[in-house]
Curated annotation (Swiss-Prot):
Keyword Lyase annotated: yes
Gene Ontology terms: biological process: amino acid metabolic process; biosynthetic process; hyperosmotic salinity response; response to abscisic acid; response to jasmonic acid; response to microbial phytotoxin; response to wounding
Gene giving rise to this polypeptide: CORI3
Catalytic activity: L-cystine + H2O = S-sulfanyl-L-cysteine + pyruvate + NH4(+)
Miscellaneous information on this protein: Induction by wounding requires COI1.
UniProt-recorded name of the protein: Cystine lyase CORI3
Cofactor: pyridoxal 5'-phosphate
InterPro entries, alphabetized: Aminotransferase_I/II_large, PyrdxlP-dep_Trfase, PyrdxlP-dep_Trfase_major, PyrdxlP-dep_Trfase_small, TyrNic_aminoTrfase
Keyword Lyase: yes
Cellular component terms per the entry's GO annotation: apoplast; cytosol; plant-type vacuole
GO MF annotations in UniProt: L-cystine L-cysteine-lyase (deaminating); pyridoxal phosphate binding; transaminase activity
E.C. number(s) listed in UniProt: 4.4.1.35
């Protein structure tokens, strides 16, 4: 008797998402954690299942549950109260104020990125993405068969955008430049003057600016956060955000996309209609969280963010100071935001390390330490180190990193100064 697997079935799995999935951060992260020994020393960073958020946010969700205000389906574009609350919150410092109609609630910032890519994707179109940058922009672009062109940064100028590289990449099929501010993984925050220059360049090139601002609440450097929407009088701007990083609730899956459109360009070019159509056929963020958004945004005390930012600043100072004892890694600037250190890998310092992926694979196997390779962020032979952990745990992680580098080193390189210069 023939088994079912012997039958020549007329169906098979689609490979439509294969290439995109290979570029996702989740694929890199899962592969590295799988190399760690669950019976060895504690795996770092720990894969936390419990995150502590603001008590105000927790109360807001409980209130929505008890009142039943989050039990029903939400409109495809988002709950009116949530959209209004986001608009009011983001309007601080904006000369051109947002309305609820300019806000689209999304299933986290990832769906906001998907929305930004999908509503603009056309045959032969290309998009400018940062290198390095958050992989989800690349993942979605690959999935939509968009041509991706990577622009560069100037590490010696605190990772400002290299406008010459932007100008050289644009042609008649380029529709947008994506930026991340504060930047993941560089950790820098753009000045108002730099963002204005970007807006003027984008206007000249006739492309829009899409700004991922999800890390705006993790700022701890001297530069203030400046929203890209402030320059919508110069160029059409799309901003992306969510409560995941600021409130430490990535599992709540609630974000937004906003259209900053002074002269109705998005309406005239049918971008507004495309955004509405996209959300009509896609999943919505949890209604119960949307119902809690007004209280979360309005009532969370500043002390919550101050405490979080102080914690991150302390860890950056600690981690940055320790890196000077690892000559094979160069951190060009002390981060001003986010939860990472971004370092360049000097392959000439090692006897048996081929590239950043090989470094991270061996590090995971030998030290139970997960550091992400730069190739995951479209920049080969760099590394992203998480610093979002308590000081004793971070110290352990950095000691393991140094031990690994010393063990594989082919020489004793000179000590670097605190600025990462050899």
């Amino acid at each position: 008797m023939a088994t079912l697997k012997c039958i020549d079935w007329q169906f098979s799995g689609s490979e439509a998402a294969k290439d995109a999935a290979a570029a996702s951060l989740g694929s890199y992260t899962s592969a590295l954690y799988a190399l760690c020994d669950p019976h060895g020393k504690p795996i770092l960073p720990p894969r936390n299942e419990i995150l502590e958020t603001s008590n105000t946010a927790e109360k807001a969700v409980v209130k929505a549950v008890l009142y039943g205000s989050g039990n029903a389906y939400a409109p495809s574009l988002g709950l009116a109260a949530a959209k209004s609350a986001v608009a009011e919150y983001l309007n601080q410092g904006l000369p051109k104020k947002l309305t609820a109609d300019d806000v689209f609630m999304t299933l986290g910032c990832k769906q906001a990125i998907e929305l930004a890519v999908d509503i603009l994707a056309k045959p032969k179109a290309n998009v400018l993405l940062p290198s390095p940058g958050f992989p989800w922009d690349l993942v979605r672009s690959i999935y939509k068969n968009l041509e991706v062109r990577h622009y560069n940064f100037l590490p010696e100028k605190n990772f400002e955008i290299d406008f010459d590289s932007v100008r050289a990449l644009v042609d008649e099929n380029t529709f947008a430049i994506f930026i991340i501010n504060p930047h993941n993984p560089n950790g820098n925050t753009y000045s108002e003057a730099h963002l204005k220059q970007l807006a003027e360049l984008a206007k000249e090139l006739k492309i829009m600016v899409v700004s991922d601002e999800v890390f705006r609440w993790t700022l701890f450097g001297s530069n203030p956060f400046v929203p890209m929407g402030k320059f919508s009088s110069i160029v059409p701007v799309v901003t992306l955000g969510s409560i995941s990083k600021g409130w430490k609730v990535p599992g709540w899956r609630t974000g937004w996309l906003t259209l900053h459109d002074l002269d109705g360009v998005f309406r005239n070019t049918k971008v507004l209609q495309a955004a509405q159509d996209f959300l009509q056929i896609n999943n919505n963020p949890p209604t119960v969280i949307q119902a809690a958004i007004p209280d979360i945004l309005e009532k969370t005390p500043q002390e919550f963010f101050d405490k979080r930012q102080s914690f991150l600043k302390d860890k950056v100072e600690f981690g940055y100071s320790k890196l000077k004892y690892i000559p094979s890694l160069t951190c060009y600037m002390k981060p001003e935001a986010c939860t990472f250190l971004w370092t360049e890998l000097d392959l000439s310092s090692f006897v048996d390390i081929e590239d950043d992926q090989d470094f991270c694979n061996k590090l995971a196997k030998e030290e139970n330490l997960v550091v992400l390779p730069g190739i995951a962020f479209s920049q080969k032979n760099w590394l992203r180190h998480s610093i979002d952990m308590e000081t004793p745990v971070l110290e352990d992680a950095l000691e393991r990193l140094k031990s690994f580098c010393d063990r594989h080193s082919n020489k004793k390189a000179p000590l670097k100064d605190v600025n990462g210069v050899k």
